[in-house]
Amino acid sequence: MSKHLLLGWTLSLCVLTALSGSATMAVAASSNATAVSDTQSVSLAGGKLNFVLEGVEARILNSENGGTMYFDPKSERAIIVTEGPAPTAGTTPDAAFRIAVDTLKDKQQAASPNFRMTSEKTIQVNGLRMYRLDGTDDFNGLKLLMASLMTMSDQKITIIEVMSSENDPTGHTAALKNILGK
């Protein structure tokens, strides 16, 4: 899988994070990534979800919503993390969560007509209710494993997208376990 094709694909997926009113993920990424570091510590959902990524390049996607793409050049895995205001106006927390889940599924399908959902479930992670959507995609011949994780906390929505080559299901699963603290 070509790094440039994967990066182009991940940048196009940023539209998934446009779940709240005026929040858009117009990519404002600089052309230069940060240097590959030994570790990148990630803290999300008000500190309730923390994980460490090793050997990744970090690219800021949108400072308004805190979007960052972490790219592992060794495995060619991309992880996109975005936080922004939750779509909660006039709704209960449960209704807002359901609206966000439905919107995420719709946006995922709209981003690529070749996306195929393989499973979806709601799980508990560190006291957070988290929606998980797994699937596969074929984007211009690139066969990808996809996982979308979404949670809401303190009027913020957090979305994590994990994209890996279909040839690396073990690495894809390990990346998800790392993020979920399992």
Segments predicted by a language model, with ranges:
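Signal peptide processing junction and immediate N-terminal pro/mature segment
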Residues: 20-31
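N-terminal "mature-domain start" segment
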Residues: 29-67
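Surface-exposed amphipathic alpha-helical segments
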Residues: 48, 53-57, 156-182
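Short, solvent-exposed coil/turn segments at beta-strand boundaries
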Residues: 55, 74-75, 128, 151-157
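Conserved polar/disulfide-associated segments of primarily extracytoplasmic proteins
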Residues: 64-145
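A short, solvent-exposed beta-edge/loop patch
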Residues: 133, 144-158
